């Protein structure tokens, strides 16, 4: 996986709640022009759970087409880490095969939510999906969402026994997990899935981030990651601290509710629309977002 900085993309909707494809393409191009290495369509932040199978595939397709046709500032191509998560292994497998067929660089697969599988069930789930494709696979551990954690022993077993399982997105909130995973397998790539811990994870064995805040501030997320990769601890910490209040504000309600409203307030999407059961943020949250964006001089 030849990338380090990436954003978990929001999925913009029109007022009728259909996917706003033009806005989606524009957001991806902004990621490219502001220095991100990769984009992650249709993950948690992309509201994948409320997209139809057809919409899910179309979002992956748009991301791949846009990255293929738009060069980065270094005249290269931004990578696409396609979200293929589902609580049905068969659906994830289908999405994984589709993503590979149309040119995704790698896939991100979340643990099945609601089902609460055993560790053996998780192992078989990930193994089955990974063995159906040849491109790299990133595990995604986010127990607050799924109700089940990929135990360290299970993650290590998957890495050791399934050749194309190369990485894990760590959104457990546990630095202890990160340090333990890195201690046991230095080549197992760890990506931060928790913006408030980006700096800490990068200096505890992590090699990159998948950021929500990066939707709004891709340049600063990219700069922080690049500083960390060069072992410029203090410079990376200064950027992390600079983003502290924004990271906090974007998670006062369930993700992606605040980030979509923030993107709207910043003029980056026309409609801050959500599909039920997600709803618009409270007045208090909107006021907090407005105040925070003013502090960062995103809005006047």
Curated annotation (Swiss-Prot):
Catalytic residues, chain numbering: 140 (proton donor/acceptor), 169 (schiff-base intermediate with substrate)
EC number: 4.3.3.7
Chief site of localization: cytoplasm
Keyword Magnesium annotated: no
Cellular component aspect of the GO annotation: cytosol
Cell compartment(s), UniProt: Cytoplasm
One Pfam family from the record: DHDPS
The reaction(s) this protein catalyses: L-aspartate 4-semialdehyde + pyruvate = (2S,4S)-4-hydroxy-2,3,4,5-tetrahydrodipicolinate + H2O + H(+)
NCBIfam families per UniProt: dapA
Family stated for the protein in its record: Belongs to the DapA family.
Subunit structure as annotated in this protein's UniProt entry: Homotetramer; dimer of dimers.
Name used for this protein in its record: 4-hydroxy-tetrahydrodipicolinate synthase
Gene giving rise to this polypeptide: dapA
